[in-house]
């Protein structure tokens, strides 16, 4: 899964990458720095702790990302 959403503070999008096949779990933040995680669970936890709807141009994009993360977590937990 790759997802982009636009921060109020940057011309470049924030990017979320969850790639189970290749073991890549990373984000690019508004300041274009990044974070790399050991698992999708760590990445999701970081996003929920550090990003808020008010950080982004579109609340809709933010909530859609949260839905995607919820669905992803459900699929992993249920083994689908």
Language-model features: where?
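Mixed-charge, Lys/Arg-enriched low-complexity segments
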Residues: 35-80
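Short aromatic-glycine-(Arg/Gly/Cys) micro-motifs in beta-strand/loop hairpins
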Residues: 8-31
């Amino acid at each position: 899964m790759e997802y982009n959403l636009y921060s109020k503070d940057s011309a470049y999008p924030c990017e979320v990458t969850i790639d189970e096949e290749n073991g890549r779990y990373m984000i690019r933040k508004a300041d274009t720095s990044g974070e790399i995680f050991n698992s999708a669970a760590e990445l999701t936890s970081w996003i929920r702790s550090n990003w808020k709807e008010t950080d982004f141009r579109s609340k809709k994009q933010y909530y859609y990302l949260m839905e995607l993360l919820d669905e992803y977590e459900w699929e992993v937990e249920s083994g689908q």
